[in-house]
From Swiss-Prot:
This is UDP-N-acetylglucosamine transferase subunit ALG13. It comes from the Eukaryota. Pfam families: Glyco_tran_28_C. Involved in protein N-glycosylation. Essential for the second step of the dolichol-linked oligosaccharide pathway. The gene is ALG13. Keywords: Endoplasmic reticulum, Glycosyltransferase, Transferase. Its main location: endoplasmic reticulum. One of its GO terms (cellular component) is endoplasmic reticulum.
């Protein structure tokens, strides 16, 4: 008979092996389930990793712009087209497949669009044109976009807000916001129409700014004001015609001045001057000088 008192104390790994062996004993002999246990363990780890990844994505959506968390980099752009008049040519450009594909190529994964609030006979003409443009380019099918109509965040501030998204990019679009600064504060870069108020809002919050001038407007003081701010290195400006040429020229998209400058600005490789926090005399001087010309 075996003398159990002669057994030496077992080490932890030996206890584990002994326990695993005994618990799998049956009338038919030993049944080793180590491999099965290993597969289950790996599956549990995989599920935990997937859950963690989903949590990280949700966390990143609430973080300030360009935060790096476990190699997930969030880059975001706000495009504002103005409120009272629909900037149709700008909307057509920024919703074009060429424009969106270049954003994805530059790893810009969040695009926020304020498309306008032009009302006539109780109809939001800006929203109608925005929807028509999406349908014209067939963006939902082309980019396999999911749509969420439910307002996000402070819905009392926003009108007509929707979210379009796929695995590469999120497009948050709204007609008007009474608190546009909450979007300006939380993006990496802004592309804005050349309205003086919009330019000043962006510069006061020290955001890299590209201004798009509607050169079809009569008595276009927007152009002169944008030129002066650019001369002082507070922003960069393009006419809508120039932007259209850069976006639609497929052969030179990767090397175009617009896309290079946008990429450098959003990555901090191109620095603009910050508008001094003064009593506004610089802004007043620029505006008055241009209006007097």
């Amino acid at each position: 008979m075996f003398d159990w008192r002669r057994l030496k104390p077992l080490r932890p790994h030996q206890i584990f092996f002994f326990y695993t062996t005994i618990q799998n004993y049956s009338d038919n002999g030993y049944q080793y389930s180590y491999k099965s246990n290993q597969i289950k363990s790996n599956q549990i780890k995989l599920n935990q990793q997937q859950q963690t990844s989903r949590q990280l994505i949700r966390i990143n959506n609430q973080l300030p712009p360009s935060v790096v968390l476990h190699n997930i980099i969030m880059k975001s752009i706000l495009i504002t087209t103005g409120a009272t008049i629909t900037f149709k040519s700008l909307i057509q450009i920024i919703l074009s497949p060429q424009f969106l594909n270049n954003l994805i190529r530059l790893k810009i994964n969040k695009l926020i669009i304020q498309y306008g609030h032009e009302i006539k006979n109780s109809i939001n003409l800006s929203e109608s044109f925005f929807n028509e443009t999406i349908n014209k380019y067939d963006l939902i099918n082309l980019f396999n976009l999911e749509i969420e109509e439910t307002p996000i965040g402070d819905d009392d501030d926003d009108e007509g807000i929707r979210l379009f998204k796929n695995s590469d990019i999120e497009i948050l679009a709204f007609s008007y916001s009474s608190n546009i600064n909450k979007y300006i504060e939380n993006v990496d870069l802004i592309i804005s129409h050349a309205g003086t108020g919009s330019i000043i809002d962006c510069l006061h919050l020290n955001k890299p700014l590209i201004v798009i001038v509607n050169d079809k407007l009569m008595d276009n003081h927007q152009l002169e004001i944008a030129q002066q701010f650019t001369k002082l290195n507070y922003c960069i400006y393009y006419s809508i015609k120039e932007l259209e040429q850069y976006v639609n020229n497929n052969d030179n998209n990767k090397d175009s001045r617009f896309w290079n400058q946008l990429n450098q600005l959003i990555n901090g490789e191109l620095q603009l001057n910050k508008l001094p926090q003064t009593d506004g005399s610089i802004i007043e001087t620029i505006i008055c000088e241009e209006l007097e010309k």
